[in-house]
């Protein structure tokens, strides 16, 4: 995707959730999540506010959002009204971060005329609500910190920590349909 292509990206940005706009239409997935992302970002990106947005803002607004535009629910905004009064438990359905989410990426591009190799790829490795963002220079090679590199089992230490936090604190019920519920008190 090219954000400089005015036909593909008329506003100079591109918001994509996996499987929402590629492949066969009958296989579309993530459409609700993309609707939410566009609803959150469009007002910001179509004003002067877009120049103030940082990758961290985008992670907070999108990757860590518990809003569902399809249903109108926003667990962050309306937490006290929406979750179970006794337990803080909420049903996980069509939020941008899914139970299976293991990474979120924001590319921080450069201004026209600047070296494109100065682009920074900000990465949240692991479940976004339980993980930290770190920068990687696109134009560099062999720069991955050891805690990001895969170990002998193919796992990143940083990702494993975030995924452990997710299973211990957010999706902590593994019986019956328990995996479809999240503990919003921990989020």
List each language-model region with its residue ranges.
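C-terminus-biased signal that marks the final domain/tail of proteins
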Residues: 1-187
């Amino acid at each position: 995707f090219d954000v400089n292509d005015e036909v593909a990206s008329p506003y100079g940005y591109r918001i994509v959730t996996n499987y929402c706009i590629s492949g066969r239409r009958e296989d579309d997935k993530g459409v609700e999540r993309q609707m939410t992302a566009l609803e959150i970002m469009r007002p910001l990106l179509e004003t002067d506010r877009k120049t103030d947005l940082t990758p961290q803002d985008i992670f907070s607004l999108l990757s860590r959002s518990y809003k569902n535009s399809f249903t109108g629910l926003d667990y962050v905004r309306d937490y006290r009204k929406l979750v179970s009064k006794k337990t803080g438990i909420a049903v996980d359905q069509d939020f941008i971060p899914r139970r299976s989410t293991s990474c979120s990426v924001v590319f921080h591009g450069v201004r026209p005329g600047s070296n494109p190799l100065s682009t920074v790829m900000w990465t949240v490795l692991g479940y976004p609500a339980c993980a930290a963002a770190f920068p990687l220079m696109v134009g560099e090679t062999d720069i991955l910190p050891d805690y990001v590199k895969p170990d002998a089992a193919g796992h990143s230490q940083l990702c494993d920590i975030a995924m452990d936090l997710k299973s211990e604190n957010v999706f902590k019920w593994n019986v019956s349909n328990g995996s479809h519920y999240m503990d919003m008190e921990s989020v």
